[in-house]
Amino acid sequence: MIIRSPEPEVKILVDRDPIKTSFEEWAKPGHFSRTIAKGPDTTTWIWNLHADAHDFDSHTSDLEEISRKVFSAHFGQLSIIFLWLSGMYFHGARFSNYEAWLSDPTHIGPSAQVVWPIVGQEILNGDVGGGFRGIQITSGFFQIWRASGITSELQLYCTAIGALVFAALMLFAGWFHYHKAAPKLAWFQDVESMLNHHLAGLLGLGSLSWAGHQVHVSLPINQFLNAGVDPKEIPLPHEFILNRDLLAQLYPSFAEGATPFFTLNWSKYSEFLTFRGGLDPVTGGLWLTDIAHHHLAIAILFLIAGHMYRTNWGIGHGIKDILEAHKGPFTGQGHKGLYEILTTSWHAQLSLNLAMLGSLTIIVAHHMYSMPPYPYLATDYATQLSLFTHHMWIGGFLIVGAAAHAAIFMVRDYDPTNRYNDLLDRVLRHRDAIISHLNWVCIFLGFHSFGLYIHNDTMSALGRPQDMFSDTAIQLQPVFAQWIQNTHALAPGVTAPGETASTSLTWGGGELVAVGGKVALLPIPLGTADFLVHHIHAFTIHVTVLILLKGVLFARSSRLIPDKANLGFRFPCDGPGRGGTCQVSAWDHVFLGLFWMYNAISVVIFHFSWKMQSDVWGSISDQGVVTHITGGNFAQSSITINGWLRDFLWAQASQVIQSYGSSLSAYGLFFLGAHFVWAFSLMFLFSGRGYWQELIESIVWAHNKLKVAPATQPRALSIIQGRAVGVTHYLLGGIATTWAFFLARIIAVG
């Protein structure tokens, strides 16, 4: 008998060569579906092809295969992102005035696109200063490049090439992990290992390496730039890394190396890891030493967080245990069963992630202007407005996406048999109470918020300003918001040792910061006007939530259609025999939710744009007198609907409407074109399918008469296709119109 030592158990987590690589198959449209692969009978085929190409649930019901497809697609997505980034850096290297901007960021505008003269397009190349003619960019790339220590266009070239290499690598990884070594389902469901890698690896080591880059490269280079040293004279990044004496000249404690760290004498590092608060008066951005400190702290937190969960060693938390331990006195089974949901339904997982990421994106929008992180960002008003608007729209779309995937989870992945009395079941059982209360809140907010405006418009029209809600008549001060502002303004010196200013100048208390005669930031006053528009925000957000939440909670069943789950995620009506059952699918709720999301975000960006032009942005004279772009008219003008129309939309549209013949004329054309795209959507939203089918049939008759009828039968768009085309053009047209309006205005006056 041979005694063997037990073999160590190694889990095999991948399948080798599971699916052969076949270009013939890829070249066949609809290869993922037996029906679509047959080819087109009617024009509906092309719609189904697009609708189902990425709906992996419809290709197979095998969770492992779905997981692999999603995983592989993520690498494709990353590849596109790297390609896009490479393009941005390449434009910076090849077509931009980055080096000129770097030497004088207050007088030279950022430009990274020069239009070729074909039939007069060169009119678009405006004078951005320093003798450079090009299109002014508003993406903030120049500011982030300066903050990271890029001093030449050669460095941008190298980064662009590096990004292309990574794009190729990602494409390869996507192919490799689907066709050559595809992970097993168990790998996708190993949440503790995933948390370990994402928290400690991605966020922890990612933040740590960025903090290291900031300390060793960004800080010294920015120190030189702020002192007015010519970028060409500044040592290159690798010289700072390899030569400690260079850094020690700027930060003497560098000479001591890591000794203070191991002897716990950390205060030695306070030269370059600071906790100041406020803005750097030279650049109008956050102190880069504060930012480096922040990333170091974040890195420590996430490195610890990444080691809290139980993986191969039997210590640490298990997510399943944590969830099942969450039981309150009134919550029945509590979170029991949520673990199974989140590891078997990627829609449920995605829904949570989208809700979190969407909220985070909106938080980013609000911090980019109140705590501008990059040098010379705060005085670049066009970029500030663009970044705010961009992050608000993205956040809105992500949150609607969260509701969409929550509803898909409810329809496709929810299994009522093993859900009893846990939190989700309890929410579903009192959904009527939730939705009816939410409905009441929406009615209350709608009537009261608009009622205040209508009152003001009426009093204004009757010439009774003393009876209006305003800062000079009947005041409705946002006292709670002002209290929060005050608390933050008084916080420095009380909360953190050595903190000299509050987190943001907007809280109040501090002086204003101006760079090159332009206001970077100052305390933002809040008054009656903000109180009114704030309640419009509350109203539009609650209506959006009402629509989306109703779609999720009634996705499987309702009193009207008890068997809704059998009809799927999107369906036009419940059969011909039941009137009044159209537009009730979960998909239709997402469709309607998108319009209200558009309403909500529009009011937010209008509020921001006008408020900043009126109360923050402007120029400052040698005597210290601030002249705001619209002269502080927000408080008195925005308290009536007429004021919004006259003093915001109409008054500020003059730049885009009069842009023809100037370098801003493209915005004028976009403004016009995007209005057309928006109007085009109404044709799809306000018409019936039957009307178009009749029209198509008479056109087909004419084609048959002339013997030019195609083999593929034309079909009118289905009800759902029509609504999809409608909402797409509505949003695209509306967003592009707003974009052109904002940018023509702010580039002209900012």
UniProtKB/Swiss-Prot annotation:
Domain of life (superkingdom): Eukaryota
Residues annotated for [4Fe-4S] cluster binding in this entry: C573, C582
Biological process per Gene Ontology, one example term: photosynthesis
InterPro entries in the cross-refs: PSI_PsaA, PSI_PsaA/B, PSI_PsaA/B_CS, PSI_PsaA/B_sf
Plastid in keyword set: yes
Entry's cofactor comment: P700 is a chlorophyll a/chlorophyll a' dimer, A0 is one or more chlorophyll a, A1 is one or both phylloquinones and FX is a shared 4Fe-4S iron-sulfur center.
Name of the molecule in the record: Photosystem I P700 chlorophyll a apoprotein A1
